[in-house]
């Protein structure tokens, strides 16, 4: 998928010294060695041809647009490897959600903030990793992300360092202190510019508001989202503005074991502009006496189709779990630089793209975690086999230099040695 050209398009290149592609490749493969860069340098194993300072300078480069890099790479994978194999009527979606990027034990990290973790219902030090992903219902690919600090200066532990205002790094820092709904629109615009094929944008109630629905619609996507049952948010129903709870109480519900309780058409009004929408009230499985509201700006979709498409939003939750449990998201990078943390996030996203694509192309029933462990074992085998082959080549060279023996005889000795080793080891060496 032309990784080097994607890096170059994102301004990740060097005029001299080690190429950016080699440094990125080293960081990409680091997780599969089960050791950090520090431990590799300490024990002298799997050490690169460049110093650690080269890696740190690369990750702190201000001019690299990591949002653009992951967007371009995911766009190429989607267009070249996934969409051609999908049916034309499949509903491809973009999914927006955030997750905690924890730095609880840090004090001097750039733009560090006290953020609320909605999953654990407590405040933590770190960032909100706002992520945009793509899914066709079978394969999920991360598209881009931004590490959000907070627009509230009281909750911000450290401010951004002074950088050149013309650089991508400065724009990245300015976006980090914007509201999540504004940052979400920037990520969607980046995906739209890359022409990623998707018709709907899915998000939960944290991002749902009439303003957000209008903004996403202006970019060119329909929205299917969960909406809060708050008395402060109004929608126009029968020429009257009212909250969703009032609309629910005014209508007769469906009886029996139906997938939904009620379906109504409303108008989403913002600054005099009206967008027609359909609201589907579904029963809350966790609390049977309560209901949830799913809204779609595509009123031509059936209620069952709205519920089915919104179910694809769960893919991004699986993505967050795999990245944190297996791909060392936030654990591998302890840098205090905001640019380095952004680079680390892009590298983790690229690793997940590889796992996701491998799972799809191999028609593999294994989970992402199982695939990760498989690749880790495979990397260990390759390293060991390379060392064994080097020893075998040195043995052949010593025989040729110090003993008067023909090449045919050396081949016979090597073949006899290979026949004498265990079958399992022999099969791995022959496969290599």
What are these regions (language model features)?
Residues 1-13, 70, 89-90, 107, ...:
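Single, function-defining residue in the core of a domain
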Residues 24, 127-130, 182-189:
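Short, contiguous clusters of charged residues that form electrostatic/catalytic patches at enzyme active sites
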Residues 23-28, 129, 347-355:
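Short, amphipathic alpha-helical segments that act as regulatory/interfacial helices
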Residues 27-42, 68-77, 133-139, 293-296, ...:
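Short N-terminal helix-initiation segments at or just after the protein's N-terminus
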Residues 20, 35, 52, 66, ...:
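Alpha-helix initiation and N-capping motif
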Residues 1-68:
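Gly/serine-rich nucleotide phosphate-binding loop at the start of the catalytic core
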Residues 11, 61-152, 264-265:
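Active-site-proximal, Lys/Arg-enriched surface segment
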């Amino acid at each position: 998928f032309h990784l080097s050209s994607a890096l170059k398009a994102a301004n990740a290149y060097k005029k001299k010294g080690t190429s950016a592609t080699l440094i990125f490749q080293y960081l990409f493969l680091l997780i599969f060695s089960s050791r950090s860069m520090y431990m590799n340098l300490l024990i002298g194993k799997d050490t690169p041809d460049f110093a650690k300072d080269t890696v740190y300078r690369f990750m702190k480069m201000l001019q690299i647009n990591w949002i653009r890099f992951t967007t371009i790479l995911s766009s190429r994978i989607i267009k070249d490897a996934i969409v051609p194999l999908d049916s034309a009527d499949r509903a491809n979606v973009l999914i927006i959600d955030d997750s905690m990027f924890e730095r609880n034990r840090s004090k001097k990290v750039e733009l560090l903030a006290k953020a609320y973790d909605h999953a654990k219902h407590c405040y933590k030090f770190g960032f909100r990793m706002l992520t945009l992903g793509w899914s066709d219902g079978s394969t999920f690919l991360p598209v881009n992300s931004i590490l959000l600090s907070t627009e509230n200066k009281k909750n911000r532990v450290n401010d951004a360092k002074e950088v050149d205002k013309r650089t991508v790094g400065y724009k990245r820092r300015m976006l980090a202190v914007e509201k999540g709904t504004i940052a979400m629109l920037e990520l969607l615009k980046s995906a739209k510019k890359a022409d990623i094929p998707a018709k709907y944008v899915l998000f939960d109630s944290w991002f749902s508001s009439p303003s957000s629905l209008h903004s996403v619609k202006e970019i060119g996507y329909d929205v299917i989202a969960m909406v809060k049952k708050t008395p402060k948010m109004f929608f126009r129903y029968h020429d009257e503005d009212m909250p969703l709870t009032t609309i629910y109480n005014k209508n007769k519900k469906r009886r029996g074991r139906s997938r939904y309780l009620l379906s109504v058409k409303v108008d989403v009004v913002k600054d005099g502009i009206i967008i027609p929408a359909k609201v589907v009230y579904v029963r809350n499985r966790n609390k049977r006496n309560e209901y949830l509201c799913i809204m779609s700006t595509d009123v031509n979709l059936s209620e069952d189709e709205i519920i089915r498409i919104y179910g694809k939003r769960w893919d991004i939750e699986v993505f967050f779990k795999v990245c944190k449990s297996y791909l060392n998201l936030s654990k591998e990078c302890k840098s205090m630089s905001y640019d380095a943390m952004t680079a680390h996030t892009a590298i983790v996203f690229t690793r997940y793209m590889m796992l996701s694509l491998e799972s799809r192309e191999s028609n593999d029933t294994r989970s992402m975690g199982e695939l990760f462990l498989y690749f880790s074992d495979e990397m260990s085998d390759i390293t060991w086999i390379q060392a064994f082959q080097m020893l075998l080549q040195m043995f052949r060279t010593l025989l040729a230099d110090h003993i008067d023996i023909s090449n045919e005889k050396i081949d016979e000795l090597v073949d006899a040695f290979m026949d004498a080793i265990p079958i399992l080891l022999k099969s791995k060496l022959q496969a290599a």
